[in-house]
Amino acid sequence: MLRYAIIFFIIAIIAAVFGFGGIAAGAAEIAKILFYIFVVIFLVTLLLGVVRR
């Protein structure tokens, strides 16, 4: 149990460094772009699945 607490503490420290730095804004923009790309890919594969039936 102590091992998990230490692991999550280290993850929280790393997230705080990224969150309080300027990296968070850049990562959010990249995440938005990736979100829209994957939505388009999902819709294309959905349409291809419907057309093949």
From Swiss-Prot:
Transmembrane segments: 5-25, 30-50
Pfam families assigned: DUF1328
Membrane topology, record value: Multi-pass membrane protein
Keywords on record: Cell membrane, Membrane, Transmembrane, Transmembrane helix
Compartments, as annotated in UniProt: Cell membrane
Annotated GO CC locations: plasma membrane
InterPro entries per record: DUF1328
Stored NCBIfam families: PRK13682.1-1, PRK13682.1-4
Family per record: Belongs to the UPF0391 family.
HAMAP family in the record: UPF0391
Name of this protein: UPF0391 membrane protein Bcen2424_6479
Organism: Burkholderia cenocepacia (strain HI2424)
